[in-house]
């Protein structure tokens, strides 16, 4: 559609079809989005791109393996051919659905459920066509080629992301999923490695091929630095960074050095003056060089800044000398001049700015681009434009599963080809037949990918440059915590650096990152979460754009003289300068029009920078973008009839979201393009701007937000009225919502998760937000609507504790189940010996625990329904003792115990036992123990507003206050929790909940809507209550009315996973560490409680010397040691024979016994091992005593 077709229409009554849409209609559009995309689309699309395109590209770009036999010199034997060349090349790759091979060699389709239960890896086999060519060159110069094709050679297994297009669950209906034992609400987006679910966390990085100019903080050698991290589009090398630096005015000697500009080149040790680089590229005359930097000779200020650099390079006046100057500073020293010049040429061609081109004739392009970097540096130095912002989100790219796995696969495939090469070379040299089946080690790729996904160390094992924590175990506490984990991203900045800048919320993150959801503490602001409607681009090829630009009048460098550049607009595609254009306005309009018609990929970003006279087009991967309504002429292009058509659809498949994008009602805008748009916040703002243009911000809105509440992420979208809370409270709730108990998946009965928490009676909240329906929070809730009173009652709810109604608890209020799984397998200990499940026999088994073995069946497993308590054995397992070992021990033992017992602090029921075989065909078992957790004093609860509290007291219903209607609260919260924390959202939620309960419908608490407290109060008054939610209550102990009115109503509360039963810990005597003989640490090891430095200081301040000695010495690690009085070192003591001596002093009499901490004795002996003698002198103490 053309832009000029729209005349301003006459003001008549609008037709029903052309009616404007309302904010309510926007939710139909949002529903269409989530129906089509789901919540982890960014993971799935990225992985699909890797499987469908990247892998084949990596195989294609690997060069053929070429092998020439090393000539064996056989004097009498004349060979038939002058030489033989072997060539091996890889072709098409094939990937099947995920398969598994049983230990007996049978293959079968693998389903995720089986992979989880049997600890298998959910991966698909990868095959590739290999061609082997043998070229034999005769003595007469003719060639004979034998070609042999191997089709579908197995080269490894690739882990498959669940719900991606190669997964067995892809596009299954709800019914099919349920039959496969999968949860229909599970979004996929993770891998299963050895039975555990792994997520790839998106990694943030600076964008490549982008010129940044930064001002250095003085004092510094440099005033300004321009940098570009250059990386060719389809290349597998690390980016080569080029710096162009302007030296600061005053040099170290105090003299003025002039502002020289120098640049770094890869593999060159020192910085090279820029003019020399230009001359080495073949631009010798000063005029030519300046034309490529300044473009406009009338700009005297800029020319002046370049004068020192020209003078510095005055000595070098032709290309060869310049190349030699560079070559001399290269890595190799002492080669001939020709070699040096060739080396410098190669570096300039292949290593400097590789994204501009690494071919033969890129000198002009390179010179222009290099000049552009300097031009930007000078603009900044002259103060004509500000320095770049490192933290701007347009300058960031996200590495998702696709690029991460791509880099890994590329590395492993290279390794594979190297191995093939060395194997074939060996075969050829020894005159063996080349068998490709043996040459290709499939284990390289299989175990490489598996290792990285399993450990999270990205890169080879123990190599430098590996990133840790890229892959993490999927958090399965609550459904919301799972979703949030799949949408998380990480900035690889050291957590130690106390830099505030990268952690702060940047304006450009609006709508891309959630402003509330980030952890507290050292990772604050570095770990972020995606907002709800973000889409991360997967990247598309740049060549359609380049062709389009060529057709639409872009002039490239060969066609123009540098003097036209200041008038024209520079055009960049993915950071590469491709030319200039005289009519950028038309070009941008055309590009956008094509993008809205989907003739150009919808994820292409078009940025027109008017001040810099640049047009930047991006097609690369990893940019954050989000959908917006398109506005034309202050009207939305989407009309009521389109919404109506959307609501009338029969099924989700037919024209939904993608249809709206294709029709040009909605487009994706990335962070950088967002800077060039004018976005209206709500649809009503747009209407206001049309009705009262004089009051409007602008006459030309270009886009409109679909809904402002979509700037929040998964966890913050669950908070009601977050716009009425102080911001840190929303951050706290985002963290706590991930620890709430609910139902984390619907198939939890069939899963054997290590830890699982399930609430008995979860309820959907009375007060909801519109985003919840897309997060499935109503189907899988994590909390209960409790009747909450805000009041002081008895004083047992001080300091963030709450009083709970014991009668409600007895009725099942907040009761929950806790599952823990134990696993064990029969490992092979060599060829014949293997472990065995079975009930150990006290007579013949050594090393048996002191726990009870009675709960075990004959197969060595506790049957389901058995009640077990601390240290009961639940899996019995023994290994045979080898003969030579048995000789030393008493001969009656034939086996050794390797059983697994319940954790000593837990009790419960055996819930389920799974006995199966793992990938190696060995038997292995998982036992799930279930325990019921009833709320008790000390358990932690929280509302949805970051108001966490522990239970301080439980009162029965008779002791709780009650209203005239006979309502008693379930929870009483202290009023002091409200004023300083300013969580007004909780109060509004409470009265809204009261109205909702009365009218029997959900209250809407979506942020940034026009719901006001007054409206809710009026509705509450209509229901016959005091309008602000206060009620008259009666004291439960005395029955007299309480003097104050009490604020009471339903509030949604969450039970958090921190329970007192899991934390309670005390110890008298117990286990000690072997090395220091001090008490062990931690509840799991039954450890002691540390009396730390601060406690010690308090005791010193009190002057409680005896208590201090008791804590730090008698109760910790008292140790008796014998000391020689002569030298003060530890003496030899034999208490059985009652003989003592110090051999160094030949002293057997003057020996005293002292008590010191064992840790101190250890330190002394460690010092002795370093030839330092700490002497414990007791003599003068003794003499001092004698004098008294």
UniProtKB/Swiss-Prot annotation:
Binding site for Mg(2+): 800
Taxonomic superkingdom: Eukaryota
Region (Disordered): 852-871, 877-897
Keyword terms, alphabetized: DNA-directed RNA polymerase, Magnesium, Metal-binding, Nucleotidyltransferase, Nucleus, Transcription, Transferase, Zinc, Zinc-finger
Polar residues bias (residue ranges): 879-892
Major site of localization recorded for this protein: nucleus
GO molecular function: DNA binding; DNA-directed RNA polymerase activity; ribonucleoside binding; zinc ion binding
CC per GO annotation: mitochondrion; plasmodesma; plastid; RNA polymerase II, core complex
Family: Belongs to the RNA polymerase beta chain family.
Note, other: The binding of ribonucleoside triphosphate to the RNA polymerase II transcribing complex probably involves a two-step mechanism. The initial binding seems to occur at the entry (E) site and involves a magnesium ion coordinated by three conserved aspartate residues of the two largest RNA Pol II subunits.
The name this protein goes by in its record: DNA-directed RNA polymerase II subunit 2
Organism: Arabidopsis thaliana
């Amino acid at each position: 559609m053309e832009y000029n077709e729209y005349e301003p229409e006459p003001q008549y009554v609008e037709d029903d079809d052309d009616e404007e849409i309302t904010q309510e209609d926007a939710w139909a559009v949002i529903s269409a989005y989530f129906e089509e995309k789901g919540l982890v689309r960014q993971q799935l699309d990225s992985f699909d791109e890797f499987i469908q395109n990247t892998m084949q590209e990596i195989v294609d770009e690997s060069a053929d393996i070429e092998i020439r036999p090393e000539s064996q010199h056989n004097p009498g034997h004349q060979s038939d051919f002058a030489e033989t060349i072997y060539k091996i090349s890889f072709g098409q790759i094939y990937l099947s659905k995920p398969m598994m091979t049983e230990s007996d060699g049978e293959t079968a389709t693998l389903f995720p459920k089986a992979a989880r239960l049997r600890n298998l890896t959910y991966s698909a086999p990868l095959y590739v066509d290999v061609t082997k060519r043998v070229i034999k060159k005769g003595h007469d110069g003719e060639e004979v080629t034998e070609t042999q094709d191997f089709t579908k050679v197995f080269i490894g297994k690739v882990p498959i992301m669940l719900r991606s297009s190669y997964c067995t669950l892809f596009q299954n209906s709800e019914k099919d999923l349920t039959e496969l034992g999968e949860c229909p609400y599970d979004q996929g987006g993770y891998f299963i490695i050895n039975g555990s679910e792994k997520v790839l966390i998106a990694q943030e990085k600076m964008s490549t091929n982008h010129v940044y100019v930064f001002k250095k903080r003085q004092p510094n050698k440099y005033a300004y630095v321009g940098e570009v991290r250059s990386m060719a589009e389809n290349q597998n090398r690390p980016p080569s960074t080029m710096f162009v630096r302007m030296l600061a005015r005053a040099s170290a000697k105090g003299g003025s050095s002039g502002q020289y500009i120098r640049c770094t080149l890869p593999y060159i040790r020192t910085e090279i003056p820029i003019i020399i680089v230009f001359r080495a590229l073949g631009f010798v005359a000063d005029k030519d060089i300046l034309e490529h930097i300044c473009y406009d000779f009338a700009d005297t200020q800029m020319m002046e800044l370049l004068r020192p650099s020209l003078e510095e390079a005055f000595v070098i006046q032709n290309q060869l000398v310049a190349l030699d100057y560079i070559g001399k500073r290269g890595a190799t020293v002492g080669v001939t001049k020709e070699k040096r010049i060739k080396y410098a040429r190669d570096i300039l061609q292949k290593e400097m700015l590789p994204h501009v081109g690494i071919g033969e004739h890129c000198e002009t392009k390179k010179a222009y681009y290099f000049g552009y970097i300097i031009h930007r540096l000078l603009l900044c130095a002259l103060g004509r434009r500000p320095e770049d912002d490192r933290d701007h989100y347009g300058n960031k790219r996200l590495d998702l599963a696709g690029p991460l796995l791509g880099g890994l696969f590329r590395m492993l495939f290279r390794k594979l080809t190297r191995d093939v090469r060395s194997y074939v070379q060996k075969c050829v040299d020894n005159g063996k037949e080349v068998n490709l089946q043996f040459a290709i080690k499939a284990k390289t790729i299989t175990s490489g990918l598996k290792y990285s996904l399993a450990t999270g160390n990205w890169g080879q094992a123990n190599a430098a440059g590996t990133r840790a924590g890229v892959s993490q175990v999927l958090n399965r506490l609550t459904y919301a915590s799972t979703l949030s984990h799949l949408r998380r991203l990480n900035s690889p900045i050291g957590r130690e650096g106390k830099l505030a800048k990268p952690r702060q919320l940047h304006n450009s993150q609006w709508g891309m990152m959630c402003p509330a959801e980030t952890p507290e503490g050292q990772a604050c602001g570095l770990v972020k979460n995606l907002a709800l409607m973000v889409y991360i681009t997967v990247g598309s090829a740049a060549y359609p754009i380049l062709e389009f630009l060529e057709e639409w009048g872009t002039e490239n460098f060969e066609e123009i003289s540098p003097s036209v550049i200041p008038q024209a607009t520079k055009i960049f595609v993915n950071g590469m300068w491709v030319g200039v254009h005289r009519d950028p306005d038309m070009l941008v309009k055309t590009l956008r029009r094509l993008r809205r018609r989907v003739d150009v990929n919808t994820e292409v970003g078009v940025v027109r920078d008017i001040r810099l006279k640049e047009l930047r087009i991006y097609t690369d991967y990893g940019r954050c973008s989000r959908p917006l309504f398109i506005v034309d002429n202050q009207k939305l292009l989407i009309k009521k009839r389109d919404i109506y058509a959307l609501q009338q659809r029969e099924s989700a498949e037919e024209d939904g979201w993608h249809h709206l994008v294709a029709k040009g009602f909605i487009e994706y805008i990335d962070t950088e393009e967002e800077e060039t748009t004018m976005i209206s916040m709500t649809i009503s703002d747009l209407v206001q701007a049309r009705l009262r243009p004089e009051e409007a911000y602008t006459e030309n809105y270009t886009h409109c937000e679909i809904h402002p509440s979509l700037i929040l992420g998964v966890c913050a979208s669950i908070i009601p009225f977050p716009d009425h809370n102080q911001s840190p409270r929303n951050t706290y709730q985002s963290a706590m919502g991930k620890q709430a108990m609910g139902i984390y998946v619907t198939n939890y009965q069939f899963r054997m998760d290590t830890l699982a928490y399930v609430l008995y009676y979860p309820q959907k909240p009375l007060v909801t937000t519109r985003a919840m329906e897309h997060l499935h929070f109503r189907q899988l809730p994590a909390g209960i609507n409790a009747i909450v009173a805000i009041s002081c009652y008895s004083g047992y709810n001080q300091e963030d504790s709450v009083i709970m109604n014991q009668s409600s608890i007895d009725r099942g209020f907040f009761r929950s189940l806790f599952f823990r799984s134990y696993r064990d397998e029969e490992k092979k200990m060599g060829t014949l010996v293997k472990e065995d499940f079975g009930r150990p026999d006290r007579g013949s088994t050594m090393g048996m625990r002191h726990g009870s073995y009675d709960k075990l069946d004959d197969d060595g497993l506790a049957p389901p329904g058995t009640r077990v308590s601390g240290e009961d054995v639940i899996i019995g397992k023994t290994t045979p003792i080898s003969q030579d070992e048995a000789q030393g021990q008493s001969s009656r033992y034939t086996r050794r115990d390797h059983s697994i017992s319940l954790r000593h602090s837990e009790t419960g029921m055996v819930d389920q036992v799974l006995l199966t075989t793992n990938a190696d065909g060995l038997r292995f078992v998982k036992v799930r123990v279930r325990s019921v957790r009833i709320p008790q004093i000390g358990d932690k609860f929280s509302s949805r507003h970051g108001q966490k509290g522990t239970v301080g007291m439980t009162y029965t219903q008779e002791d709780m206050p009650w209203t005239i209607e006979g309502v008693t609260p379930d929870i009483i919260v202290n009023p002091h929790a409200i004023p300083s924390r300013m969580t007004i959202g909780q109060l509004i939620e409470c009265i809204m909940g009261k109205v909702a309960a009365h009218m029997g419908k959900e209250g809407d608490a979506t942020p940034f809507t026009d719901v006001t407290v007054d409206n809710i109060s009026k509705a509450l008054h209509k229901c016959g209550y005091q309008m602000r939610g206060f009620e008259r209550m009666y004291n439960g102990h005395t029955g007299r009315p309480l003097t104050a009115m009490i604020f009471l109503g339903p509030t949604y509360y969450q039970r958090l996973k921190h329970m007192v039963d899991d934390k309670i810990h005390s110890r008298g005597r117990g286990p000690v560490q072997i090395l220091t003989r001090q008490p062990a640490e931690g509840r799991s090891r039954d450890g002691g409680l540390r009396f730390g430095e601060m406690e010690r200081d308090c005791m010193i301040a009190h002057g409680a010397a005896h208590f201090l000695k008791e804590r730090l010495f008698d109760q910790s690690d008292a140790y008796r040691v014998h000391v020689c009085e002569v030298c003060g070192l530890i003496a030899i003591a034999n208490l059985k024979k009652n003989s003592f001596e110090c051999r160094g002093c030949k002293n057997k009499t003057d020996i005293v016994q002292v008590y010191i901490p064992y840790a101190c004795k250890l330190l002394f002996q460690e010092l002795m091992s370093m030839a330092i003698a700490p002497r414990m002198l007791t003599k003068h103490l003794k003499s001092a005593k004698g004098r008294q």
